UniProtKB/Swiss-Prot annotation:
Acidic residues compositional bias, start-end: 573-589
Entry-linked InterPro entries: Rab3GAP1 (IPR045700), Rab3GAP1_C (IPR045698), Rab3GAP1_conserved (IPR026147)
Source organism, top-level taxon: Eukaryota
Identification of the protein by name: Rab3 GTPase-activating protein catalytic subunit
GO CC annotations, alphabetized: cis-Golgi network; endoplasmic reticulum
Region (Disordered): 532-613
Naturally occurring in which organism (per UniProt): Danio rerio
Major localization listed first in the record, in broad terms: cytoplasm
Keywords: Cytoplasm, Endoplasmic reticulum, Golgi apparatus, GTPase activation
Pfam families the UniProt entry points to: Rab3-GAP_cat_C, Rab3-GTPase_cat
Length: 969
């Protein structure tokens, strides 16, 4: 009892009747969102202009809300307009209609071609939608629908929001909405009916008018006039009289070898199917009244030819198959493969190659054998490679080869047109390499994409690889062609044949790496060819000198063995050059330094031309510019490798010194050439010519008072341990032709050939992908120029810009490259659509009777490509309308199996019209009914009422907005 009497032990149960329920929390959350979006109070908007729903910008914002554990998405849709609040805020009336109610009666934006379905059905410019979340079930039961609508009504009343608020109910695919809009003393209810079949009594205008009148229940007599807008849509799918403009290339002829090699340089273009699948004609009768038009179950006045407004939209085929896009896609697929050439072509071929190449591995041992009976040229490495190459080719040309001989020969002839010339003239032929105009678009394009010039060998190779991959065997054909290409490169190197289609000079670092490698090989061939030509002339000079008893003939630049004196120079192989160089290098190493210097003093060598103004400071003899070695050309991978090596040397003094010595090879060579050309010269003479800024002149007064100009080295040249001073002291007077080569063309050529031989098909296609994209862009530009499509031009600029950024990366991402190819395919489809429409409307042919009609048709076709829906000038009586009418008549006759007679079509006989209607039954009918009546009582305010009706073969939809006066009800 004591415990019970303790006041602290007593417990009081408190019931909090203010606790909010889940329903109240949901309503509160809706109100918070409306406040966040500033949708509270009255809205002011500018009057809607005609077509603004289509041309204007629609924006939206969304948030997530919950009713207990059920997720909803609330979205605000609105047409972006300039604010009109400052202009009309002072003029607002206290009981003004909400903006949405005013939009119900606006006739400037009926049937917008591209808008939200609620905009089309109810004509509102701003609204809010509450819909179930992505993974939530639909609101189907009537109780849940009523609960949501009650929540909406309460939230609108509490906040004073005048923006209509909709709730999505039923299954999402049915697009069923119910909503409400509240204003001061007024309310509009948005209701909807959706059926699968059209009830027979409502399959015409008169039945729908009955529904509308019964729903609004106007007590006035007579009933205020009802504004009627009607749109019938007719679909054309059969293009009977229109020939498809795309002419596919004759691939059978190409396979049979009947098409010349030039065909390999052309990328295909165009759609394989008609990219225009349907044409939708909308015949519109705006702003009719009930007594003007008759449409019931017995008779209808609604003839599309008599409609005052026509508009057309085209439906395009989804992802049409296009030739260029298919080429690019199949080519890109090879980039993702990992097989080597041996794995693709099979081990048998590789084994045969290894068997035949055994001669190459024994080449060096054969060269060292003491046998004198074997001619020197039979023992050379190059001849071994050449003979093995011939045997490999013989083994490859079997019926199992991916490429047959005819196709392969056509490709090689296209790649190397100089091969068709007489063999005696091949080495003398220099292909005409036309450098692109620096102002041309092509020049800047290959610069941007890091590809290659469009007239180069690499460009042609990319096109051939692309074609054989698509038409002649896929990746196996690619591997086969690449092997043949590498063999051709080796043949040209061995035989001093310049590579056709490559610009002379060092590798162009603006191009792709493969193009640089081929340019490097061409440089090697040029150097080797020039050296061999120089030796040929030296040998003839040496022979003449020996006949005169001149001792200089026995030098390293002599003719060589006496038994070769009567031998043609063309019969010498590369092995003799290589062997001769080894001997000459050995003799040069044995040569005494002092003897060489004495000889250089007595006879200057390697002079190019006198300088003109400078003389040697000590001897006052003219200063001669020497013949120097050209610096070694390098590709970007070699430059990167060299920079990495130099960077690894570090920043220490020893590392810096070693780095300077590595970079001074060219300087030392130039010093030796300068000494040979200018006996008795000094370092000051060399610096004065080679680096004028390091030669400092100053005026000095001698003992006799005469002013002289004397020169000296700059301060940096006087630093102890200067690399220039060390190099000058070690440099010998040796002309460039007797120096050790800065650029070993034999070594570099073999490195390039080895690099090419190791390329997998996937690596090859990655190298050539910029060239293929470059060719595709040029092809699209060429095709677009004939069509004059501004949208395509702007798209091409964007594609070029994005592709250049991607391809500049050493390892571009495949996903981004796929996006570029997809964009090119989309542009190709646009051009194909333009050609299809021009063919259908007779723009390309000579069918148009008057020039002004042709111009109007061209503008009409261009608009169809750019806009979602295009108005037809003159409706059915204009130039475009006449063509559309003929298209439908032709389709109708074909559908009814009646032969088409052109004369009857032109005359349009009445009997024929009765038998065969010009248009099929409309695929869709849209009827819009509007009026303004007092509701619910005769003395209520006159408020807008609207009913939008959609009648299709498998759908019947009524979307109504019915307003009522709530002041006293």
């Amino acid at each position: 009892m004591a415990a019970d009497s303790d006041p602290e032990s007593e417990v009081f149960e408190i019931t909090d009747f203010t606790t909010a329920s889940e329903w109240e929390r949901f309503i509160s959350r809706v109100e918070e969102v409306l406040n966040d979006w500033k949708l509270i109070g009255s809205r002011v908007g500018k009057p809607l202009e005609k077509g603004e729903y289509t041309s204007g910008t629609w924006e939206e914002s969304s948030q997530e809300i919950s009713f207990a554990d059920f997720k909803f998405s609330i979205t605000h849709h609105y047409l972006k307009q300039e604010s009109a609040e400052n202009d009309g805020r002072d003029e607002l009336e206290e009981d003004a209609y909400p903006l949405a109610m005013q939009d119900l009666l606006c006739i400037n934006n009926d049937f917008p071609p591209r808008a939200h379905c609620l905009v089309r059905w109810f004509g509102v410019r701003e609204f809010v939608v509450i819909s179930p979340g992505a993974n939530c079930e639909a609101i189907i039961s009537e109780s849940k629908c009523s609960l949501l609508l009650s929540s909406v009504s309460i939230a609108l009343a509490n906040t004073g929001c005048q923006v209509p608020l909709f709730v999505q109910i039923q299954q999402k695919h049915r697009k069923m909405f119910s909503g409400e809009c509240q204003g001061p003393g007024v309310r509009s209810d948005f209701e909807m009916v959706h059926l699968r079949r059209v009830p027979s009594q409502y399959n015409h205008l008169s039945g729908l008018l009955d529904i509308f009148k019964n729903k609004i229940g106007c007590p006035l007599t007579p009933l205020p006039p009802i504004n009627i807008s009607i749109r019938f849509t007719y679909v054309l799918q059969d293009w009977q009289q229109c020939s498809w403009p795309q002419q596919p290339p004759d691939f059978d002829a190409l396979l049979a070898g009947e098409v010349g090699g030039v065909e390999f340089g052309k990328l295909p273009f165009g759609a394989c199917e008609d990219p225009i699948s349907e044409l939708h004609l909308a015949a519109t009768w705006p702003s009719l009244t009930e007594g003007i038009v008759v449409d019931n179950d017995v008779y209808s006045d609604l003839d599309p030819l008599q409609a005052p407004h026509w508009s057309v939209r085209v439906r395009t085929a989804e992802n049409p198959q296009c030739l260029l896009g298919e080429f690019l896609t199949e080519f890109f697929k090879i980039c993702c493969r990992k097989e080597t050439t041996e794995e693709i072509l099979g081990r048998s071929t590789a084994e045969e190659e290894g068997k035949e190449n055994s001669d190459i591995t024994q080449a060096l041992s054969k060269l060292t054998e003491p046998s004198t009976a074997v001619p020197i040229h039979k023992l050379s490495v190059s001849s071994m490679v050449h003979s093995a190459r011939k045997r490999i080719r013989r083994h490859r040309r079997v019926p199992e080869s991916p490429l047959n001989n005819d196709v392969l020969n056509s490709i090689l002839l296209y790649l190397f047109p100089d091969a068709a010339l007489d063999k005696a003239d091949v080495s003398e032929v220099r292909p005409p390499q036309q450098s692109p105009d620096r102002q041309s678009e092509d020049y800047h394009l290959y610069n941007q994409l890091k590809s290659c010039p469009s007239d180069s060998l690499t460009h042609r190779l990319a096109l051939c690889i692309c074609m054989v991959n698509f038409h002649h065997g896929g990746v196996r054909a690619v591997a086969h062609l690449w092997q043949e290409f590498v063999l051709e490169m080796r043949y040209r190197w061995e035989n001093n044949c310049l590579i056709y289609g490559l610009a002379s000079g060092p590798p162009d670092l603006r191009c792709c790496l493969l193009h640089q490698k081929l340019q490097m090989l061409n440089c090697c061939i040029e150097r080797k060819k020039a050296r061999d030509d120089g030796k040929k002339s030296s040998s003839s000079d040496g022979a003449r000198d020996r006949s005169r008893g001149a001792p200089e003939g026995a030098g390293p630049e002599g003719a060589g063995p006496a038994e070769a004196a009567g031998k043609s120079w063309d019969s010498w192989s590369d092995s003799e050059d290589e062997f001769f160089e080894c001997v000459s290098d050995t003799e040069e190493m044995k040569e005494d330094k002092e003897e060489a210097e004495n000889r250089s003093r007595s006879k200057p060598e390697g002079r190019l031309q006198p300088h003109g103004t400078h003389t040697l400071l000590n001897t006052q003899e003219p200063l001669y510019i020497p013949i120097t070695q050209e610096p070694a050309p390098m590709t970007e991978d070699l430059l990167e490798e060299q920079s990495e090596v130099l960077a690894k040397l570090g920043t220490s003094a020893e590392g810096a010194h070693l780095r300077a010595r590595m970079q001074s090879a060219c300087l030392l060579s130039d010093m030796e050439s300068f000494k040979a050309a200018n006996p008795g010269c000094t370092l000051l003479d060399f610096v004065r010519w080679y680096s004028p800024r390091d030669y400092v002149e100053e005026q000095v007064t001698d003992a006799d008072g005469r002013v002289e100009v004397r020169g000296e080295l700059s301060a940096r040249m006087k630093i102890p341990g200067n690399m220039w001073v060390e190099a000058w002291e070690t440099a010998r007077a040796t002309p460039a032709r007797r120096q050790k080569r800065l650029f070993d063309d034999t070594k570099e050529a073999e490195k390039v050939l080895h690099y090419l031989a190791l390329q997998k098909p996937s690596e090859l296609t990655r190298h050539l992908l910029p060239c293929v994209l470059h060719a595709a862009l040029l092809k699209i530009k060429e095709e677009e120029s004939a069509e004059d499509l501004p949208s395509v031009r702007s798209s091409l600029q964007q594609i070029s810009s994005s592709a250049s950024k991607i391809l500049r990366h050493p390892n571009p991402e495949f996903k981004k490259l796929e996006d570029v190819i997809s964009q090119l395919m989309a542009v190709e489809a646009v051009i194909a659509r333009a050609r299809s429409l021009k063919a259908k409307f007779g723009v390309c042919g000579g069918e148009r009777e008057r020039e002004e009609d042709g111009d109007e048709l061209e503008r009409f076709v261009s608009s169809l490509l750019e806009e979602p829906e295009v108005c037809v000038s003159g409706a059915g009586r204009g130039p475009a309308g006449n063509v559309i009418h003929k298209l439908f008549v032709s389709s109708q006759r074909a559908a009814l199996l009646a032969p088409m007679e052109e004369e009857t079509l032109r005359s349009g006989g009445s009997d024929d019209r009765k038998a065969f209607p010009d248009f099929p039954p409309p695929a869709g009918r849209e009827i819009l009914l509007r009026t303004c009546v007092p509701r619910p009582a005769p003395y209520s305010k006159a408020l807008p009422q609207r009913l939008f009706c959609v009648l299709m073969r498998d759908e019947f939809r009524l979307a109504g907005a019915f307003s009522s006066d709530t002041s006293f009800f």
